[in-house]
């Protein structure tokens, strides 16, 4: 899993402050905007934070990508297994961590599977993934269309997505997906996005009390 910055609105925070002062044109060019952005956050004036956007590149797997793509306030571009050979990203499918199902919460897992048992199960998963990749390659070698051959690939297959959204959308996404109730693998991505956000929107992050 990796997250990296692709692009951001130039002078993103200053741009939001400039637009926020639309009704006070005499002060629009003021460089003292930290207090204004803090005020807007404190009083839930969120439309201001829709005026700057950020694009991130995220490398994950197809299973987690499906969760990310549900955030419809963003725009996305994803690596196409229909157009391109999946092995262009990686010819190896990483074996996932294994956690026990929480019997009281279907959307939670507990990290208490014994190491010996986990290694044994992961060995079987690795064998299954290797077989899936060999079969995928065999189908392509026989001239089967990529759009058909891809159906034999597991959800753990690596993918790459570009995720673009406003500062406001990123705040919502990071708050939601870094909280309890999010799958660990997705939470790790949200926390990595948060680190990028803190560097690119330092005043906003400080006002949100993001550590």
List the predicted regions and their residue ranges:
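Family-specific signature for flavin-dependent thymidylate synthase
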Residues: 1-211
